[in-house]
């Protein structure tokens, strides 16, 4: 049975199965509007989910009742629970490599319990893009790319050997080699089809392209009308094995776009403004669908930039409709005309083609309006993406923000730059300027604007500030090709923005070290140093450990701030520097207008560029091709590896789950505040030499220069466990004012490290809980932020609210996500974190899904809301997580 379309035994209860002709070819479809006429008033995203149910109907798991429930969806009624079979899965390596290690370990357990190894294999197409590993160590030189690539391969050889084994062993798995591109840009420019033409059956089939990805920014592909969202690596393993995702149909918010952006306003400005407004409005967990006359003012690349930051405004998906602009983008990126014909014919037949006249009849939960003409040039920072600052008020806003960072005491630092020049820097000194991230480098208009601005700056004689580390890491080689064709790459080079990698780099914290002369001066003085990047996240401590304030900006503004060298400036009125003629040069003097950008794009951006580049997408360089790629049914673990170790999730796993018990005598490991990110819980950046993980690696004989990052070592649980809650910016109320990975061991009263306390609790058989405020687990879809706590004995997290993916990850690891009663938190309830916690009602999961459980902590008792949202999630809790549940299900069906 193929994945996309069922066999002849499909019940087809609604008579949806049909055949359409496109250009003389016949294709099977499940005709949506004929089978379910009410689908015409559903939001586009729910139409896609409805087609998915019709196509996967089996009469048992996907039955007619699910179809009826979704077809009758009431925007203001209870949310029906449905199943969803994504057409494919995409992964980046930081989360994808652990998924493959989990699959390898699960396969071993499967064989141990009597299954056949080959049965446990991917059942849907999986593309893993290696983009998270490379670091921008070398910069500002013509050979920076080559040297960083060599360092990356040397550091990650073991991980890459595992990928080569997996690609050779597992069917349906493709690996996009390192330094080729960024997952979401590769997905946008090549992998996404909008409509899938599946020729694996006797009759070719057409159905919507849908995707889940092990990265929270997977919704970027929503810009092409492809429904998809981010999931944790834990949930992804089940999806890879063909298990449907279970979900409650979310709120769907219609966002009407009106007006046109003013000249000089970029897609980055639009998405930062939209992020601010939608985050304030409250769209957490919702699907957003964009419509309205303003769509005509946005290119598909602009739409993708907006969809990329969907997690930052809190939504699950941010869907743009399929229309002529989507076809134009597919053509511009080298997709064949035959496929464009299929996309149009299928979308029009199924009611998935955008119909402006019908927008008013769609059943949305609510509608909001966003005027593109209201957007002004902006940046966001210094700590959250939603903290937008209009460019005209940045100096004032910075003064307010820096006073919080430095406690009202201004700092200065004497710095010797890499070129030997000496400078006195003040708070706000820009020490890192990074054109990075698929969010913006996927957008030709933004990258061309940066190149044109650089050209004008060079022509007027502006020089780069020598203390600024400047990097350029686009999401695909197509970017450098069209910049070179336009002659703009040389100007970026002259300002220090030389190519360092094709990978995420600074956006995920792989900025590489600052020059030691700069970093040392910053550390010694306590200077409030600044990074400006074209990424999508600027959480505290994320970008570089020696940077205290992070601002998001468009690529041309990144170049501008690198020229200014400081955030303590009003770019709308003050000069960036002095030109070769001795006159001041302002931002207005070098800012390109839209006509210039469009003219360059017309001549430099060519479909052939994309076709040529992506034809060799899976090839890799000589180092990659030289790695062994021998298929073996079971992975050959190396006992002395410090990168890859068999995970302990399946140790002692039995064919049937053990009964659940209530939680008794639990102690609080951490008492945290609001907006605790997955970076706080499980860092991804460099491993400090003095940290518990660093000490552990040194004891194994690994020199500090080879520590690599937490993200790269995510397949060694011993390293990652020692890194839990060790972010230097973490604030734990139990840590007596110390930041970082410290807590109180309640058994002894001693202040100690998180890891040492967790070990002591485990040895004493004491379960753990974590207390938190709002938005616990925000940020990256980092499965280790749930895996780690589960392995050290955390049984429950009690918070005011949870970020969507992290809540799902907690459930996926068997940890209970519990919410305080509405309007309450640890402080209002009088909790100190020193209490012993009993949680009653957990054993009810054996029979049902309890809505609340009783929490007793000392003299305080309250009913916590159980955020186990579906019956299937309750099964995960019963089984101790999604992976044991999936393993047992495969054993039963084998």
From Swiss-Prot:
<keyword id="KW-0456">Lyase</keyword>
<dbReference type="InterPro" id="IPR015931">
    <property type="entry name" value="Acnase/IPM_dHydase_lsu_aba_1/3"/>
</dbReference>
<comment type="similarity">
    <text>Belongs to the aconitase/IPM isomerase family.</text>
</comment>
<dbReference type="GO" id="GO:0017000">
    <property type="term" value="P:antibiotic biosynthetic process"/>
</dbReference>
<dbReference type="GO" id="GO:0051539">
    <property type="term" value="F:4 iron, 4 sulfur cluster binding"/>
</dbReference>
<feature type="binding site">
    <location>
        <position position="438"/>
    </location>
    <ligand>
        <name>[4Fe-4S] cluster</name>
    </ligand>
</feature>
<keyword id="KW-0004">4Fe-4S</keyword>
<dbReference type="GO" id="GO:0046872">
    <property type="term" value="F:metal ion binding"/>
</dbReference>
<dbReference type="GO" id="GO:0006099">
    <property type="term" value="P:tricarboxylic acid cycle"/>
</dbReference>
<protein>
    <recommendedName>
        <fullName>Phosphinomethylmalate isomerase</fullName>
        <ecNumber>4.2.1.166</ecNumber>
    </recommendedName>
</protein>
<dbReference type="InterPro" id="IPR036008">
    <property type="entry name" value="Aconitase_4Fe-4S_dom"/>
</dbReference>
<dbReference type="InterPro" id="IPR001030">
    <property type="entry name" value="Acoase/IPM_deHydtase_lsu_aba"/>
</dbReference>
<feature type="binding site">
    <location>
        <position position="504"/>
    </location>
    <ligand>
        <name>[4Fe-4S] cluster</name>
    </ligand>
</feature>
<keyword id="KW-0045">Antibiotic biosynthesis</keyword>
<comment type="function">
    <text>Isomerase involved in the biosynthesis of phosphinothricin tripeptide (PTT), also known as bialaphos (BA), a natural-product antibiotic and potent herbicide. Probably catalyzes the isomerization of phosphinomethylmalate to phosphinomethylisomalate. Shows no standard aconitase activity with citrate as a substrate and is not able to complement an acnA mutant.</text>
</comment>
<feature type="binding site">
    <location>
        <position position="507"/>
    </location>
    <ligand>
        <name>[4Fe-4S] cluster</name>
    </ligand>
</feature>
<dbReference type="InterPro" id="IPR006249">
    <property type="entry name" value="Aconitase/IRP2"/>
</dbReference>
<keyword id="KW-0408">Iron</keyword>
<dbReference type="GO" id="GO:0003994">
    <property type="term" value="F:aconitate hydratase activity"/>
</dbReference>
<dbReference type="InterPro" id="IPR015928">
    <property type="entry name" value="Aconitase/3IPM_dehydase_swvl"/>
</dbReference>
<dbReference type="GO" id="GO:0047456">
    <property type="term" value="F:2-methylisocitrate dehydratase activity"/>
</dbReference>
<dbReference type="Pfam" id="PF00694">
    <property type="entry name" value="Aconitase_C"/>
</dbReference>
<dbReference type="InterPro" id="IPR000573">
    <property type="entry name" value="AconitaseA/IPMdHydase_ssu_swvl"/>
</dbReference>
<comment type="pathway">
    <text>Secondary metabolite biosynthesis; bialaphos biosynthesis.</text>
</comment>
<dbReference type="InterPro" id="IPR018136">
    <property type="entry name" value="Aconitase_4Fe-4S_BS"/>
</dbReference>
<keyword id="KW-0479">Metal-binding</keyword>
<dbReference type="Pfam" id="PF00330">
    <property type="entry name" value="Aconitase"/>
</dbReference>
<keyword id="KW-0411">Iron-sulfur</keyword>
<dbReference type="InterPro" id="IPR044137">
    <property type="entry name" value="AcnA_IRP_Swivel"/>
</dbReference>
């Amino acid at each position: 049975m193929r994945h996309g379309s069922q066999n002849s035994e499909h019940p087809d209860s609604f008579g949806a199965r049909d055949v359409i002709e496109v250009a003389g070819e016949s294709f099977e479809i499940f005709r949506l509007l004929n089978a379910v006429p009410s689908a015409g008033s559903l939001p586009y995203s729910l139409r896609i989910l409805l087609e998915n149910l019709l196509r996967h109907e089996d009469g048992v798991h996907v039955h007619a009742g699910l179809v009826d429930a979704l077809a009758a969806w009431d925007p203001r009624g209870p949310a029906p629970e449905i199943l969803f079979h994504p057409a494919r899965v995409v992964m980046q390596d930081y989360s994808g490599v652990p998924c493959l290690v989990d699959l390898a370990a699960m396969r071993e357990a499967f064989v141990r319990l009597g299954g056949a190894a080959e049965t446990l294999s991917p059942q849907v197409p999986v593309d893993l893009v290696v983009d998270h590993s490379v670091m921008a160590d070398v910069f500002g030189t013509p050979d920076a790319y080559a040297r960083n690539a060599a360092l990356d391969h040397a550091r990650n050889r073991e991980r890459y050997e595992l990928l080569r084994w997996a690609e050779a062993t597992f069917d349906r798995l493709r690996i996009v080699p390192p330094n080729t591109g960024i997952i979401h840009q590769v997905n946008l420019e090549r992998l996404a089809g909008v409509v899938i033409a599946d020729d694996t059956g006797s009759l070719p089939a057409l159905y919507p392209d849908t995707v889940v990805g092990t990265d929270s920014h997977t919704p970027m592909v929503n810009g092409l009308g492809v429904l998809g969202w981010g999931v944790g690596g834990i949930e992804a393993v089940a999806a890879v094995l063909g298990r449907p995702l279970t979900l409650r149909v979310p709120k769907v918010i219609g966002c009407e776009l009106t007006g046109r952006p003013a000249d000089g306003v970029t897609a980055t400005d639009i998405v930062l403004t939209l992020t601010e407004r939608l985050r304030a409005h409250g769209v957490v967990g919702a699907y957003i669908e964009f419509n309205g006359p303003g769509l005509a003012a946005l290119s598909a690349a602009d739409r993708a930039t907006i969809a990329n930051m969907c997690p930052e405004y809190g939504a699950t998906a941010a869907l743009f409709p399929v229309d002529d602009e989507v076809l134009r983008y597919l053509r511009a990126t080298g997709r064949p005309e035959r496929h464009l014909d299929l996309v149009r014919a299928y979308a029009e037949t199924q009611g998935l083609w955008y119909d402006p006249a019908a927008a008013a009849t769609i059943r949305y939960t609510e509608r909001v309006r966003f005027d593109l003409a209201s957007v002004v040039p902006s940046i966001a920072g210094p700590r959250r993406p939603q903290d937008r600052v209009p460019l005209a008020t940045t100096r004032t806003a910075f003064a307010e923000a820096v006073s919080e960072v430095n406690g009202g005491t201004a700092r200065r630092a004497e710095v010797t730059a890499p070129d030997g020049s000496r400078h006195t820097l003040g708070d706000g000194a820009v020490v890192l300027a990074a054109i990075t991230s698929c969010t913006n480098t996927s957008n030709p208009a933004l990258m061309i604007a940066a190149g044109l601005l650089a050209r004008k700056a060079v022509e007027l004689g502006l020089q780069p500030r020598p203390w600024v580390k400047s990097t350029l890491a686009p999401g695909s080689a197509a970017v450098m090709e069209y910049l070179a064709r336009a002659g703009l790459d040389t100007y970026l080079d002259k300002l220090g923005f030389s190519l360092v990698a094709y990978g995420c780099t600074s956006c995920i914290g792989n900025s590489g070290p600052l020059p030691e002369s700069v970093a040392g001066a910053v550390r010694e003085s306590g200077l409030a140093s600044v990074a400006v990047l074209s990424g999508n996240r600027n959480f505290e401590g994320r970008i570089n450990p020696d940077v205290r304030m992070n601002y998001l900006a468009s690529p041309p503004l990144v170049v501008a701030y690198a020229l200014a060298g400081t955030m303590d400036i009003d770019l709308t009125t003050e000069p960036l520097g002095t030109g070769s003629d001795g006159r001041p040069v302002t931002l207005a003097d070098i800012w390109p207008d839209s006509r210039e950008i469009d003219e360059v794009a017309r001549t430099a951006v060519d479909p052939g560029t994309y076709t040529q580049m992506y034809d060799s997408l899976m090839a890799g360089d000589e180092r990659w091709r030289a790695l062994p790629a021998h298929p073996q049914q079971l992975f050959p673990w190396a006992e002395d590896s410090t990168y890859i170790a068999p995970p302990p999730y399946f140790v002692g796993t039995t064919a049937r789950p053990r009964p659940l018990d209530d939680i008794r005598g639990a102690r609080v490991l951490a008492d945290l505040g609001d907006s605790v990110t997955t970076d706080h819980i499980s860092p991804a950046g460099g491993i400090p030499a003095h940290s518990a993980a660093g000490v552990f690696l040194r004891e194994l004989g690994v020199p500090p220069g080879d520590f690599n990052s937490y993200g790269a070592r995510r397949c060694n649980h011993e390293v990652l466990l020692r890194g839990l809650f060790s972010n230097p910016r973490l604030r734990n109320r139990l840590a007596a004012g110390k930041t970082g990975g410290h807590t109180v061991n309640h058994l002894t009263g001693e202040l100690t490290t998180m890891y040492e306390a967790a070990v002591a609790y485990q040895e004493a058989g004491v379960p753990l809980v974590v207390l938190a405020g709002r938005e616990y687990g925000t940020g990256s879809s980092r499965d280790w932020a749930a895996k780690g706590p589960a392995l050290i004995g955390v049984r429950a997290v009690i918070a005011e609210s949870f970020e969507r993916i992290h809540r799902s990850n907690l459930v996926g690891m068997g940890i209970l996500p519990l919410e305080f009663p509405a309007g309450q938190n640890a402080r209002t309830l009088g909790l100190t974190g020193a209490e012993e916690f009993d949680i009653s009602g957990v054993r009810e999961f054996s029979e049902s899904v309890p809505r609340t459980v009783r929490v007793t902590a000392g003299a305080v008792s309250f009913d916590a809301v159980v955020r186990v949202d579906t019956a299937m999630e309750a099964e995960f809790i019963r089984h101790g997580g999604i992976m044991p549940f999936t393993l047992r299900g495969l054993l039963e069906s084998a």
